[in-house]
């Protein structure tokens, strides 16, 4: 019994100690395009009316998706993960 326990302990230590291998970082795809900016064809008041409607329904994930689409058209869209083209004032 004793040699069996020692054998499994030694095997566990050998397999449990990392060999120093590091995962290779994934390279960025050179052909990958940033996500396209979503289109919001409605007015600002329409947006807030939709927000109130979804709040009354308790549909908070839909509000978040709609807000990302709406606010992507403003200069802060780049902070939401969308590529916002340069606009002159």
Swiss-Prot record:
- What are the alphabetically sorted keywords of the record? Secreted, Signal
The answer to whether the entry has keyword Ligase is no
Q: Which domain of life is it from?
A: Eukaryota
Q: Where is the protein localized?
A: Secreted
**Spans traversing the lipid bilayer:** none
GO BP terms in the entry: sensory perception of sound
Report the GO terms under cellular component: extracellular region
- All disulfide bonds of the chain are none
Q: In which tissues is it expressed?
A: Ear specific. Expressed in the cochlea and vestibule, but not in the cochlear nerve, cochlear nucleus, spinal chord, muscle, cerebral cortex, cerebellum, diencephalon and olfactory bulb. In the cochlea, expressed in fibrocytes of the spiral limbus, spiral ligament and suprastrial zone. In the vestibule, expressed in cells located to the stroma below the macular and crista sensory epithelia and in the subepithelial layer of the walls of semicircular canals and maculae.
Its chief place of residence is secreted
Q: Look up the signal peptide feature and give its range.
A: 1-21
InterPro entries this protein is in? Otospiralin
Q: What does this protein do?
A: May be essential for the survival of the neurosensory epithelium of the inner ear.
PANTHER family associated with the record: OTOSPIRALIN
Query: Family assignment?
Result: Belongs to the otospiralin family.
This protein is called what?
Otospiralin
* Species this chain originates from: Rattus norvegicus (Rat)
The beginning of the lineage is: Eukaryota, Metazoa, Chordata, Craniata, Vertebrata
């Amino acid at each position: 019994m004793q040699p069996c326990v020692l054998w499994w302990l030694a095997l566990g230590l050998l397999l449990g100690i990392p060999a120093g291998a590091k995962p290779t970082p994934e390279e960025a795809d050179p052909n990958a395009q940033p996500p396209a900016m979503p289109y919001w064809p409605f007015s600002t008041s329409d947006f807030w009316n939709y927000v109130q409607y979804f709040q009354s329904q308790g549909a908070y994930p839909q509000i978040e998706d709609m807000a990302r689409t709406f606010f992507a058209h403003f200069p802060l869209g780049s902070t939401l993960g969308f590529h916002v083209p340069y606009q002159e004032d």
